[in-house]
Curated annotation (Swiss-Prot):
The keyword Amino-acid biosynthesis does not apply. Involved in post-transcriptional regulation of gene expression. Belongs to the LSM12 family. InterPro entries: AD, Lsm12-like, Sm. This is PBP1-interacting protein LSM12. Residues 2-69 form the Sm domain. Forms a complex composed of at least MKT1, PBP1, XAC1 and LSM12. Forms a complex composed of at least MKT1L, PBP1, XAC1 and LSM12. Within the complex, interacts with PBP1; the interaction is direct. It comes from the Eukaryota. It comes from Trypanosoma brucei brucei (strain 927/4 GUTat10.1). One of its GO terms (biological process) is mRNA stabilization. Keywords: Translation regulation.
């Protein structure tokens, strides 16, 4: 492909391109980028869709300019022409994304609250939901009847779940102590 002073000089020119395998492709140059090594040919419309060929310039053997090319580029937009709004598609995409996020949150909440034990107090589940918003990796340990953060830190109802308290295992490290303090602050907020 010859290098032009300006890549835009070729745009709109009718050409016949012979490829390295001796196949011929005709069309109007839609765009040419010598630095990227790309030539895009416009070949008219099939139905309402444009027919475009993208060719890598290393595979071009020969380019011949055509005098009266029947295929021309579509006309440019007028200065005051307005493109169709993309807002409808954007709204649909946002709605789809929001619906997906909501469905995932509901599934996660259902999984979090799934317990076969009918004796689980409602106040314990309320505390679990409150803490799960901040600490998403916690879970309900139905065998011990506690909310478990890790092996060292749990939340128990003392004496019942209307006043939950954070309990730390003996010999726990500084990280667990720090977590205990943060959880206690979270529980003290209403």
């Amino acid at each position: 492909m010859p290098v032009c002073n300006n890549d835009s000089q070729l745009i709109g020119l009718g050409v016949s391109v012979t490829l390295a395998d001796d196949t011929t492709v005709n069309g109007t140059v839609y765009t040419y980028n010598s630095s990227e090594g790309l030539l895009v040919l416009f070949q008219g419309f099939s139905g309402s869709n444009p027919n475009v060929k993208i060719i890598r310039t290393p595979f071009i053997k020969e380019v011949t300019a055509l005098r009266d090319n029947e295929e021309k580029l579509p006309p440019q937009l007028e200065a005051k022409a307005r493109l169709p709004s993309m807002q409808a598609a954007r709204d649909r995409s946002l709605f789809k994304h929001a619906s997906s996020q909501l469905r995932n949150a509901k599934d996660k909440r259902n999984q979090l609250l799934q317990t076969d034990d009918q004796k689980t107090p409602i106040a314990a589940l309320d505390t679990l939901i409150k803490l799960e918003r901040i600490y998403p990796d916690i879970h309900w340990d139905k065998d011990a009847g506690v909310i478990r953060f890790n092996q060292d830190v749990v939340v128990k109802g003392k004496p019942d779940w209307t006043s939950p308290a954070v309990v730390i295992a003996e010999g726990a490290g500084d990280i667990s102590r720090s977590l205990m303090e943060r959880v206690q602050k979270t529980l003290s907020k209403k």
